[in-house]
């Protein structure tokens, strides 16, 4: 049984409210859970003290028992300095793709050819 520390959505339509729960990975998102360890209200200001309410001791206990936090919960726990979340790095994300590079190379070659013809 693999355990996850994840968000279970509550609240009304367009007014989300999340419980931070420990649940079996196979259980439904908003369904059965083992223990509720906190709450998260995304509508509150980022610096509001009650935006994230979490029992840090329970979170540490569950992490020690092998529960895996989801990406969003890992971000929240990192913000509370409970765990250290590794930052993701994709240096190729902003680079042009293959066809765009080919077009740029063709345009550069055409510009160079035009410049050499104008100089001659």
UniProtKB/Swiss-Prot annotation:
GO MF term (any one): structural constituent of ribosome
Protein origin, superkingdom: Bacteria
Biased composition (Low complexity): 103-120
A Gene Ontology term for the protein's cellular component: small ribosomal subunit
Family annotation (Gene3D superfamilies): 3.30.1320.10
PROSITE patterns: RIBOSOMAL_S16
Region described as Disordered: spans on this chain: 84-120
Pfam families reported in the protein's UniProt record: Ribosomal_S16
InterPro entries with a match to the protein in the record: Ribosomal_bS16, Ribosomal_bS16_CS, Ribosomal_bS16_dom_sf
GO biological process, one term: translation
Keywords attached to this entry: Ribonucleoprotein, Ribosomal protein
Homology family: Belongs to the bacterial ribosomal protein bS16 family.
Protein name as it appears in the record: Small ribosomal subunit protein bS16
Gene, per the UniProt record: rpsP
